[in-house]
Amino acid sequence: MGTLSEASQVKSNEASAQDFEREPVPAHMRKKWLSMSLVWIAIGIDLSAMFLGAELGNGMNLSDSLTATVIGSVILGLIGALCAFVGAKTGLSTAMISRFLFGNVGARIVSIVLGIFSLGWFGVQVGFFASNMHTAFDKLVGVDLPLGLLSFIGGLLMMSTAIWGYRSIERLSVWSVPLLVIFIGIAVFTAFKTKGTAAIWQPISASPIPMGTAISLVIGIFIVGTVLSPDIGRWARTPMHAVTAAFIGFFVGNSFMTVIAIFLSRLMDTDDLTNIFIALGLGLPAIIVLTLAQWTTNTNNLYSASLGFSVVFQRVPKKLITIIAGILATLLAVFGIYDKFLSFLNVITSFVSPIGGLYTAEYLLVNRAKFTFEGIDRNKNWIIRSLIVWVVATLFAYMTTPAPDGFGLFQLTRVPALDAFIFAFIVQWIVGKLLSKKEEQKG
């Protein structure tokens, strides 16, 4: 009896250690919506949202900046819920879902793109972390730490949880979100106590930001995360758990830090969040917030990259893929990819956003029946129509992106990434309905 019990325990431990990167997450391993929403909230609480909120606070009056944040976050929540629904129904990662869209070989190209861009974004965010941590240490203790060293330390820290997969990220999020809320709450309370409420109603001190531009900034900063939401959504106990967790996670996660930064920037009359914390006498909380905010967000970037590369390198263990990818991305940060922040953001959103429109249209409106793991190896090597729509939608994003980063030919929603998502969704629906039956007959 003891031997059987031990064997059962070993199997249970082995199952709990798996991340199911190339197969559906089993039903008995799936999670409830609350813990999943904390993961998405933790991802949304990052330095990018903090600095966006500070920019909005300085460029808009209080009511307009809050309105833009709420509208943008609702749109993100809806897109994230839609994409997470597909992840929960299939139990598969974004990269694995792409096999139904692009074919078994075509999906490898898409997975390489997802992996490379996620790695690059990991490097950018590590650089972001290093730059702000450098400022914090310089102001607090007068120590001028090299950016390369801070990037290296930050990269290894953020890699540590991604190596162990979703459940490690979940534990980090469950512990870090309450801590972040407490320390950020202390900062807001201290700022109001020090400055009073009159400051938040003061006229703007920078060039005004139009409402449309503000909404586009709120959406653009997080839309790639919504496209990759099946990576988390596949762990949901039911599709409704995924939809609920994604909407709450993206709405609260994206808006929380932005709204906090709006208030702090108006109270303190500066858009430098690191200096705001230090000016309030909150040096240690500043370091904790900087660390946890980037750690919880950026570990997910590496996690998504490793899931993408797991589809390409199918015989290599995911942990090894994560370690190699994490080291490479950390080196990118050490050598200054952070300096290319805006250019890289434009490229990644143009290429990745259409993929979300493609797989949601294909699953919801074209051919849901083919999204079965049992038949995935019988897929064609190439599904040309989806590859063509992806390329055209990416070009469409560049057409709506203002010069010099894009062609600037016209505007749709003022958010090129959202333009690409909508365009890909509509075109994939139309083309898919026209051609999918012919594909089945030929197959």
List where the protein language model places each region:
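Membrane-interface loop-to-helix entry segments
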Residues: 130, 149, 153-191, 205, ...
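Hydrophobic alpha-helical segments and their helix-loop junctions in multi-pass secondary transporters
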Residues: 162, 178-204, 218-222, 261-266, ...
